[in-house]
Amino acid sequence: MARTFFVGGNFKLNGSKQSIKEIVERLNTASIPENVEVVICPPATYLDYSVSLVKKPQVTVGAQNAYLKASGAFTGENSVDQIKDVGAKWVILGHSERRSYFHEDDKFIADKTKFALGQGVGVILCIGETLEEKKAGKTLDVVERQLNAVLEEVKDWTNVVVAYEPVWAIGTGLAATPEDAQDIHASIRKFLASKLGDKAASELRILYGGSANGSNAVTFKDKADVDGFLVGGASLKPEFVDIINSRN
């Protein structure tokens, strides 16, 4: 079964009503293939607004984070039910910025993933190594450790999309070569096949998330295990449409 091309746009802590309106209107008027799934993830403040603007069936809205409780005294957090209530369908979990700046460890991310899936949203699960880990030859050790934590909690990965984001490439302008990305993605899929079975692993989408942009996205076109992109800064710019159309 062919895996549907998936492009996530992580706006991070960027955007205003005006800029988000411009981004969504650009998507609404762009020529986008029917066989692509696009998820834009604005700051939580603008989730409701973004949902109201989207007109393309290929485009849905996701959150950048969610807590692992449905409600309660958790100041500053957003629950999965609240995200769903405003029409968002996905949530990004495990992003390297959450791991490093907010000290979210593998177990916490695994628990959040299990909870979010149980509440009925899709999860874009981020994994990846730092520059130090890459230099030490530990890339696969790191991503397998991160995946193992989630595998202990989640048995059905139907609504999970994995995003491999080499931390050393995020926001630096550096990017893994398409060949390197393919090798790592293939290794991730092989590892997941050993845990979930060949069928589940073959259906799972694995995104590349390291400084993908309108210029380099097309170079990944023929890489069998690169099923799309999780885009950061470029998702705020017109080139986001070029990334979405990079498989045409």
UniProtKB/Swiss-Prot annotation:
Annotated positions of the Phosphoserine modification: S71, S215
Enzymatic class: isomerase
Catalytic activity, reaction form: D-glyceraldehyde 3-phosphate = dihydroxyacetone phosphate
GO molecular function: triose-phosphate isomerase activity
GO biological process entries: gluconeogenesis; glyceraldehyde-3-phosphate biosynthetic process; glycerol catabolic process; glycolytic process
One Pfam short name: TIM
Residues annotated as transmembrane: none
Residues at which substrate binds: N10, K12
UniProt keywords, alphabetically: Gluconeogenesis, Glycolysis, Isomerase, Isopeptide bond, Phosphoprotein, Ubl conjugation
Active site: H95 (electrophile), E165 (proton acceptor)
Gene3D superfamilies: Aldolase class I
UniProt cross-link Glycyl lysine isopeptide (Lys-Gly) (interchain with G-Cter in ubiquitin), position: K223
SUPFAM superfamilies: Triosephosphate isomerase (TIM)
Signal peptide: none
Modified residues (Phosphothreonine): T4
Disulphide bonds in the chain: none
Domain of life assignment: Eukaryota
Note: Present with 207000 molecules/cell in log phase SD medium.
PANTHER family found in the cross-reference section: TRIOSEPHOSPHATE ISOMERASE
Protein family according to the UniProt entry: Belongs to the triosephosphate isomerase family.
The protein's name: Triosephosphate isomerase
The organism's taxonomic lineage, starting at the top: Eukaryota, Fungi, Dikarya, Ascomycota, Saccharomycotina
Gene that encodes it: TPI1
